[in-house]
Amino acid sequence: MIALRVHNTRVVSRSLTVWTRPSPTLTLSRSLATESDALDKPKTRRRKTVFTDALNSGPSFDDFVSGKASEIMDPLEAARKDPNQRLPSWLKVPIPKGKSYHNVKKDVRELKLATVCEEAKCPNIGECWGGKKSEATATIMLLGDTCTRGCRFCSVKTNRNPAKPDPMEPENTAEAISRWGLGYVVLTTVDRDDLADGGAHHLAETVMKIKQKAPQILVEVLGGDFRGDLDMATVLAKSGLDVYAHNLETVEALTPFVRDRRATYRQSLSVLQRAKETKSSLVTKTSLMLGLGETDEQILQTLKDLREINCDVVTFGQYMRPTKRHMKVVEYVTPEKFDYWRDTALEMGFLYVASGPLVRSSYKAGEAFIENVIRKRRHNVGEAPRLAQEIQPKIFRE
């Protein structure tokens, strides 16, 4: 009973404290408690009003009555029409179509071949695959569709341990090319650091089989750096190919930030140099992407470095970000600037220069000018068109 009375007294006392004017001491302690509670209590966030905001920013009832509603453009539509919000007009291309395009695509699927045209999302696929039979070009990617390196600009899949090379790939590739009747074919490859030879003998065997089935076709191989193993570059240079290509991709200062750490600027130069030293009649070729933040001085120095090793062909193209996971575009270079670099490179003595926003390493590979130069060089050095028969089988067994 005593405990009950005390409890009741406390209840009454508390109720009196609430409803009577508090003393100064109680007011101070209560105000401090209120401030502490406010700090601990999470702030109430304002509810999102996306729909309401969009409705309020749109045309009003008066706009509809006066007929001005049609003049108020939707923000998305405005972005489509604003060149600053979208890709520049010179980077837009038509949708691929045509009989030649679909024939090439069908054979690629049937023979289970990979093409860099598709893997790298090349914007010129419609023009290259859809060209006339003698002018069409295709870039077949050998040694699988998965690379052991991870360059920040490239959309090709990466893996430390990709699948083993398909032993039937050289034969299937040669068969596809003989079907298409191409005048010029480009073979490219992923980097295969997991293979002892970097895939050099596999590439060389593919070139040999193509030349056996269709000796009239000119073959360009866009190879890797073989981790700096120049003996493997020699194997590829002796395979019977017509154009030996290896891309620098960018200027020396940006190479560590753009390419995989295993690829270096000087290493790439040494590969091109070894190819030319192995066979002087070979056309050597490289490509540079612009729009990565390079300076004019850096580009000019790169061209000088290439001329010192007698590189014949250089191409310039705009870097275009494949996905949001890749490095951003620093600048969209204008067509006029590409023309400037074409003229500059030609004045420096390059045999041929392709320069434009949509130019890629294998773009316009079938230019009649390059074909004529290759055939003239072949004639001058007394080479027979049967290059495949001249290849020593031992280079594939080394």
From Swiss-Prot:
UniProt similarity note: Belongs to the radical SAM superfamily. Lipoyl synthase family.
Cofactor note: Binds 2 [4Fe-4S] clusters per subunit. One cluster is coordinated with 3 cysteines and an exchangeable S-adenosyl-L-methionine.
Keyword list, A-Z: 4Fe-4S, Iron, Iron-sulfur, Metal-binding, Mitochondrion, S-adenosyl-L-methionine, Transferase, Transit peptide
Transit peptide location: 1-32
Protein name (record): Lipoyl synthase, mitochondrial
Class of the enzyme per the UniProt entry, highest EC level: transferase
NCBIfam families for the chain: lipA, PRK05481.1, PRK12928.1
Listed GO MF terms: 4 iron, 4 sulfur cluster binding; lipoate synthase activity; metal ion binding
UniProt domain Radical SAM core: residue ranges: 132-351
